[in-house]
A protein has these predicted regions:
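Mid-bilayer segments of alpha-helical transmembrane spans in multi-pass integral membrane proteins
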Residues: 95-104, 133-145
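Membrane-interface alpha-helices at helix entry/exit sites of multi-pass transporters
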Residues: 85-89, 103-108, 115-133, 272-289
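Juxtamembrane transmembrane-helix termini in multi-pass membrane transport proteins
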Residues: 72-75, 111, 126
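Predominantly cytoplasmic-facing regulatory/coupling regions of multi-pass membrane proteins
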Residues: 1-92, 140-142, 146-248, 255, ...
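A generic structured-segment signal
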Residues: 83, 94-99, 108-109, 124, ...
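Re-entrant/interfacial helical elements at transmembrane boundaries that shape
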Residues: 104-117, 249-266
């Protein structure tokens, strides 16, 4: 019997760092929940509103499932297929780190887990994640364009650089597409148009689903709202992408809510002062509850993904010659 083979110190280091990031993410999530609960306006929970809130959480969970599916689709197209279980487990555990300051730790976490658990090369992981990110940004910008055009003055009032951020996001997306294409071609990795079409379709479903959940919440909290569903979905997509590209906004917290709040307020006309005040309160409650729905969904996905994670190596493994 030979000497026992020690567990890779790199694998242990990655797991320790991953656990530390996960714990830090949980702490920041708790702080986020506390801050949003404190900002929540008085809200009377009716059965219909409770159902809307629950369905919003489900919609956010489904969005996470679709996100894991799109990454797995890109990996398979690039010649590095992994199981659905692994894809969901890696994405779900790493996602919680997006609430850490810097807004990059979920990317680092996913790359580390993919390397340590699936043996995927870092350039391939980063390339597929870059394509995934560019696709969702492009789809969100396309869906958010109607809201941006119709509420351009309001957008400038809230975020003076907002239009430039959108143009910058598009320019960066185009530049990165070229860079990623060159890198993949040099490595003889080709992601076909079919895979890209699947990812684009999933991204459209994600944006429409999440935007619709916000609309359902607003319509339930304020039944007489005149905000069109299409503008709500478009406004959500616009707020999402601006929150994503705003530097230093962990998980887009604060930025997305503020932008959607402004767009919703300017896209709806309520003449009666009392109704106007009620509508403003309903919008405020909607954006706060919407963020809480997202946080709760992220925690649920993290718990499930953690349970699905492979067991860590048991230190030393005996081998027989």
């Amino acid at each position: 019997m030979s000497e026992a083979a020690p567990t890779s110190w790199r694998s242990r280091a990655v797991r320790l760092v991953g656990n530390a990031v996960a714990v830090a993410g949980i702490v920041f999530v708790a702080l986020t929940v506390r801050r949003h609960l404190a900002a929540l306006p008085p809200l009377q929970l009716s059965p219909s509103l409770s159902v809307s809130i629950a369905l919003g959480v489900v919609a956010n969970v489904v969005a996470m499932v679709l996100g894991a599916w799109t990454w797995r689709t890109l990996l398979a197209a690039a010649g590095a297929p992994i199981s659905w279980r692994s894809s969901f487990s890696i994405v779900g555990r790493a996602n919680l780190a997006k609430y850490l300051p810097g807004n990059v730790f979920h990317i680092v976490g996913r790359a580390g887990l993919a390397a340590s658990e699936e043996g995927l090369k870092l350039p391939l992981v980063l390339a597929t994640m870059t394509i995934e990110t560019l696709m969702i940004i492009a789809i969100a910008v396309a869906l958010g364009a109607p809201a941006a055009v119709s509420q351009l003055d309001a957008l400038r009032a809230m975020v003076p650089a907002g239009p430039w951020l959108l143009l910058g996001a598009l320019g960066l997306a185009v530049a990165l597409v070229v860079v990623v294409a060159v890198v993949l071609r040099r490595r003889r990795v080709v992601v076909g148009s079919v895979a890209l079409a699947k990812v684009a379709a999933a991204d459209v479903v994600t944006c429409v689903l999440l935007g619709s959940s916000v609309y359902a919440l607003l319509a339930t909290a304020f039944p007489t709202t005149t905000m069109p569903w299409s503008i709500c979905v478009s406004g959500f997509s616009l707020a999402w992408v601006l929150g994503f590209v705003t530097p230093g906004a962990p998980g887009g917290v604060g930025v997305r809510e503020a932008i959607f709040l402004l767009l919703a307020a300017h896209s709806t006309t309520v003449e009666h002062p009392t109704l106007a005040a009620a509508f403003s309160a309903a919008i405020a409650a909607t954006v706060v509850v919407g963020r809480l729905q997202s946080v709760v969904a992220d925690v649920i996905v993290f718990v499930v993904a953690r349970a699905m994670a492979p067991a860590p190596p048991q230190g030393r493994v005996a081998t027989i010659k």
